[in-house]
Amino acid sequence: APRPVLVVEDEPTLATAIAQRITAEGWTARVASDGASAVQAATTLRPDLVIMDIMLPVMDGLEATKRIVAERPVPVLILTARDDEADKVIGLGAGADDYMTKPFSMRELIARCKALLRRVDRAKVIAKNSENEKLLDFGSLVIDPAQRIVTVNGKQVHLTPTEFDLLATLARKPKSVLTREKLLEEVWDWVDASGTRTVDSHVKALRHKLGSKTIRTVHGVGYAFEPPEVQD
């Protein structure tokens, strides 16, 4: 079946251009021109992917993304005019999976869309493979790969599917450094590692939710999971 893609863009020329490219890929495109109607459209369409402009009338792209993702996990690719918005988009819990800065080439947009759809399929494989996996128990922080639940001091922490898979991938090898390339390959199923900023922004999101010491940066190499210190 063709994969439904929701395009949220208030600039008609761009919206049409994106929708045409998506249709040319054999996917189904549906266009919404403001944040509020995007939230409604997501409920009826149940898209496999959302392409969302950050600057929208009625409700901005970040708020719309939060609401869409809260209702049903779906990868969101944010379109932004400023490159420095990456952390705001991904790193502060709006729930987006990736972002692109305007102007961008349609070819690059479609490549990112394909990567995110692979990420959806990858997540299903990861979930299937984790069905019988034991708890990753680090005392105050517990990760349940089978149920896909993370708790800190007994309280559940809401993570996006990508954040969860990134955390679990790091936590399976505590204190070991994993390169960005390795993480992109394991979590995103990307082989060309052009999206290192994406990994960085997701790490920021995890630190934001779980505390800054949870993931250590090894400069020029990658990241390592640091189990919480055991308190006596």
Predicted regions and their residues:
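Positively charged, aromatic-enriched patches within helix-turn-helix-type DNA-binding elements
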Residues: 96, 149-214, 219-221, 227
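C-terminal end segment of the histidine kinase catalytic
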Residues: 124, 230-232
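Short amphipathic alpha-helical/adjacent loop interface patches that line ligand
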Residues: 26, 110-113, 145, 187, ...
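Short, Lys/Arg-enriched segments at the junction into DNA-binding effector domains
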Residues: 3-4, 115-177
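N-terminal/domain-start alpha-helical segments
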Residues: 1-124
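Residues at or immediately flanking beta-strands
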Residues: 4, 28, 75, 135, ...
